[in-house]
């Protein structure tokens, strides 16, 4: 199966740039939703199409996508940079990576929880601010190690650079009742065990909230 890695940029055309507040709002959760809709313009081909691409916001109107189909050129975007994604890997290859992920796990009863939020619930409220990033590092590393067991790689090292909790757009009730999802920003190094299995999992994305720009792991040789 052919996979495409594309760099997509919002057009510099003044008529498009004038729509900046709509295409790329300043508030984070609203921006994630707007970008999801924006990128659909490059991939949808009808009302029955299901999302079959991953995406990552790089800031300043630039996005990376990983998809089974090449993105369609529209006036909203500048010329796409598209290439076939077929890295030449072997067992033992070391790769540097960066990943924006919504990391969850299943609890008893089948409910899924954000790994960092769940850990923070065990910490007294007045101590949570100080505990936030150490717990994000610990839980993010443990989660990605588990991902490696399924996706045929060994985690060599990882740094959690940031952790934020995003409120889903359109939920304006009491703050504690608003549905949220956590976003881990991770960079590090991994060792490939089985190239074919690794690339298969990478093309599917890691974690959840993929519609909101999570799950796309960018890699380069170490």
Residue ranges, per PLM feature:
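RNA-interacting cores
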Residues: 1-222
């Amino acid at each position: 199966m052919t996979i495409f890695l594309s760099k997509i940029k919002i057009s510099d055309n003044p008529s498009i740039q004038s729509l900046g507040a709509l295409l790329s709002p300043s508030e984070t959760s609203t921006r994630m939703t707007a970008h999801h809709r924006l990128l659909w313009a490059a991939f949808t081909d009808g009302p029955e199409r299901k999302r079959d691409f991953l995406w990552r916001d790089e800031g300043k109107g630039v996005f990376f996508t990983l998809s089974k189909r090449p993105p369609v050129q529209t006036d909203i975007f500048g010329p796409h940079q598209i290439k076939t994604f077929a890295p030449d890997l072997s067992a033992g290859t070391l790769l540097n990576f960066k990943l924006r992920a919504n990391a969850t796990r299943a609890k008893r009863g089948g409910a899924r929880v954000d790994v960092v939020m769940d850990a923070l619930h065990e910490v007294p409220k007045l101590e949570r601010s100080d505990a936030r990033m150490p717990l994000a590092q610990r839980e993010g590393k443990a989660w990605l190690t588990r991902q490696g067991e399924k996706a045929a790689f060994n985690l060599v090292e990882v740094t959690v650079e940031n952790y934020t909790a995003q409120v889903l757009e359109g939920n304006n009730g009491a703050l504690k009742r608003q549905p949220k999802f956590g976003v881990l920003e991770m960079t590090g190094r991994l060792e490939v065990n089985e190239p074919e299995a690794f690339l298969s999992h990478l093309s599917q994305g890691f974690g959840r909230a993929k519609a909101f720009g999570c799950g796309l792991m960018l890699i380069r040789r170490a």
